[in-house]
Amino acid sequence: MLLIAHGFRDGLAAIVLGVQTPTAAQHAFAIAIALCFLAALIALHVWATRRSLQEPRAMQDGLQRIVDPLQARLLQPLISRQRYRPQDITVAPRANGRPPRHEKYCELVERGFNGWRFEVSGLVEQPLALTLDELRSLEAERQITLHKCIQGWSYTAAWQGVSLNAILDRCRPTPLARYILFRTFDDKWEEPGHGEYYGVIDLGLARTPQTLLAYDMNGQPLPTDFGAPLRLRLESQLGYKMVKWIRSMELIASYDDIGAGYSGWRADLLHYSRLAPI
């Protein structure tokens, strides 16, 4: 619209050719180049859409080889801290998905998660098994942050929990540990062929500021709709990387043999990206 408002032909020639006072021939040449570019762009989108529908895994693999290294090098090293105010908190935040419905989880909900222990295992020097009360007894961190979903909606909420960095300091990962595997109570795996719901993040991401294992939301115990008893808050990523209904965590060297080997249930089944930086 700005290009049209300021003179389409002259503006286009300035953008494409770098010419401030174009001739008629230069006008035509700039328009031809722009049309060719648009045609190529449309063709690329048509090809990519068809290919992703026909061979989603091949498309995922191809993009992962190109996009993931760029995101890891350019975006992941950036340190971000959100600082929203209490008045920014969304009155009625949207919950995505449904709580687990299987018997074991429902029994834990009825007991207020008494008897549940958050287990930390794998490539660690000191395995842990912490009750919800023990997690609450650790130094708490509080933050008000904006949650962004890949579907386009968002909400702002206050979270309280224990820093994932503090848990890592307690369990002391071995030099072989590179990733954290979160296992959950989520029962999407009960659908045939879907496998266990899980999520994986790398240790570098786990140690970034405002990365919490949250047990409270907006001053109240975490609701089941939002991931009770424990959910991951990873504020530099889109919502699907923040695993809910956490059962345990395991330090691992590789996730190649977990699920389909793409670092999470959504990446395995829905072909989501391994990284989701905001």
Where are these regions (language model features)?
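Hydrophobic alpha-helical segments
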Residues: 1-3
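Structured, non-membrane catalytic/scaffold regions adjacent to prosthetic-group chemistry
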Residues: 7-19, 23-27, 46-278
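N-terminal Sec-pathway targeting helices
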Residues: 26-34
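Hydrophobic cores of alpha-helical transmembrane segments in multi-pass inner/ER membrane proteins
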Residues: 33-44
